[in-house]
Every structure is written in structure tokens, then in C-alpha cells.
Amino acid sequence: GFEEGNEIAPEFARMAEAAGASAVAVHGRYAQQFYRGRADWDVIARVKRSVDIPVIGNGDIACGKDAQRMIDETSCDAIMVGRAAEGNPWIFRDIRSVLETGKSLPEPTIEERMALALRHAELLASYEGKSIVRMRKHAMWYVGGLKEASALRRDITTAVTLDDFRAIFERALRLNEEH
């Protein structure tokens, strides 16, 4: 729903099911929250109890343990990852590991992060040509949490070419090398 206390998700899910939907995805955050606050997983659980079709839960899944906890707490049939995958595609292997073995995987190294960021930029350049301005939004996520992230982000805002991004990712690697 739009705001807490005005919950329409279970009723809306029943209407979707009656109209022939084969599944519903539920983001447990009210529209009024935007990206603030915590997702309300109880809403997902209430939707799950109200329909016979699969329910896909979404909201506040940042690692494999979050995915397992959502499934345990809501009984949802599947989970959907949103912003947590930006700059962190490794989240999916962690989710798989936790769901299959109960164990989280180690975080990717700085070398792995920057190698993938560069590969992402290379693929975008092969698709878009010399100017890959759209890489800026993705690069911001890849450098999140690193030393000198503010300075790196400042440079990202003016990066245009693959060489620009390569230089930024190489600098991020030098600044954050694990000794």
C-alpha cells in the first residue's frame, strides 16, 4: 500500500490471483517509505497466507542469510533481490550457498570487485561505443565502502570513456590493496 495502516496487498494479491496471475511479487515497503526504513516482511507473510499462487518476497535482502530469514519468516516461495545486487552480483552465489548449505561465502576481494567493474565497463563499451556515461551509476556501486570512496565517486561523475573508468578502478585497487 501507499502508507502503513492502509494495507491493500493481501486483497490486491487475491484480485490478481482471481484474474489469472500465476504468481505475485510483494515488496514489503510502503510507497511512502521510498528507500527509507525497513521492509515489512509481515505483509509478505499475510499475502502468502491469503493466496494459493506462489509469492515472491522482496525487500531488505542484502545477503544469503537475509534470503533464508525471509523464507523462514514469511513462507514465501521465492525471493527477489533489488538494489543489493548493484555492484554486488556475488550476492546470488552467497544466497545459493546459504540456501543449499547454510553457510555464507567470503566477501569478494578488492581485486575481484575491480576486475568485475572493469569487465562491466568493457561490455558496456562494446555495446555503446566510446562514450559509456551510463557506467557512472554502476561504478558508484562498485566503489561503495572502499577507502577514498568519496574521491573515487567524484572522479566517476566526470568519467566518459573506458580508459577513464579503467584508471578509476586501477586507482581504487591501489588505494585498497590488502596487505
Report residues per predicted region.
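Short beta-strands and strand-loop turn motifs
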Residues: 25-29
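Alpha/beta catalytic cores of nucleotide-metabolism and tRNA/nucleoside-modifying enzymes
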Residues: 6-23, 35, 42, 46-57, ...
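Short, small-residue-enriched loops and turns at beta-alpha junctions
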Residues: 1-5, 30-37
